[in-house]
A protein has these predicted regions:
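Zn-dependent metallopeptidase/amidohydrolase metal-coordination segment
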Residues: 1
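Histidine-acidic metal/acid-base catalytic patches
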Residues: 24-27, 33-35, 88-110, 114-214
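Active-site acidic/histidine proton-transfer and metal-coordination neighborhood
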Residues: 6-107, 117, 193-196, 212
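Short active-site-proximal "capping" loops at secondary-structure junctions
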Residues: 4-6, 187
Length: 214
């Protein structure tokens, strides 16, 4: 399920609302038979805060959510986002937070666009345990300096410069065997009728996955 947002750096009132919303979302997951929910840390980071403090705050927030999610049999997938204002911007930062949390029901949502847009390198994936990878989003990304790509520059696989085959082979090497879905933010794609978008997603993903699995 996509997504529970702004789970860290919450004021007291916001924290109470988050608890109520998360309980509702986790209950919905159980009714729908959905075992995993995407989590986004925060876009409201205090100015001047250190990376270590962000890690602690995010880990503490995830620990609280983990307890609540466990009551419903739901896993939490933290997504790092290489966009302005995001508190968790890189693969390495996300992996560090997951190490601090160290809960079986808290893992990572790996997005190829954010990975490449944030300047991460394919070899970094070798350090990720397969049991900490819960979801995979795939889209292509143009070659840009780290953190300069625009979110609208999120394309169908094969229409950008991301090493998607290498990345997905590295994901496969972790032992991950879960969902792998297309997530494209190109406004031209978002304007397509749903049926056309689904067909195009299949046309671009099936050949990519076939090459990865050779």
């Amino acid at each position: 399920l996509n997504a529970l947002e702004s789970v860290s750096f919450q004021a007291r009132a916001g924290g109470r609302m988050l608890r109520e919303l998360s309980d509702w979302c986790f209950a919905a997951c159980r009714v729908l038979g959905c075992g995993c929910m995407e989590v986004i840390a925060s876009f409201h980071v205090p100015e001047g805060i250190s990376a270590a403090a962000i890690c602690r705050e995010t880990a503490d927030s995830l620990l609280r959510l983990s307890d609540a999610a466990a009551d419903y049999g739901v896993r939490l997938a933290l997504e790092f986002m290489a966009v302005p204002g995001s508190s968790v911007r890189t693969f390495a930062q996300c992996a560090e937070i997951l190490e601090a949390v160290d809960r079986a029901n808290v893992g990572m949502l790996f997005d190829t666009w954010h990975f490449c847009a944030g300047g991460s390198r394919p070899e970094e994936l070798s350090a990720l345990r397969g049991d900490r990878l819960f979801m995979v989003h795939v889209s292509d990304c143009p070659a840009r300096a780290p953190f300069t790509a625009q979110r609208a520059e999120s394309y169908w696989p094969g229409e950008g410069d991301a090493p998607l085959e290498e990345l997905l082979r590295s994901v496969q090497a972790t032992g991950y065997d879960g969902p792998c879905s297309v997530e494209v933010m190109d406004p031209n794609v978002l304007a397509l009728p749903a049926g056309d978008a689904i067909r195009r997603a299949a046309e671009t993903m099936k050949p990519l996955l076939a090459r990865v699995e050779r």
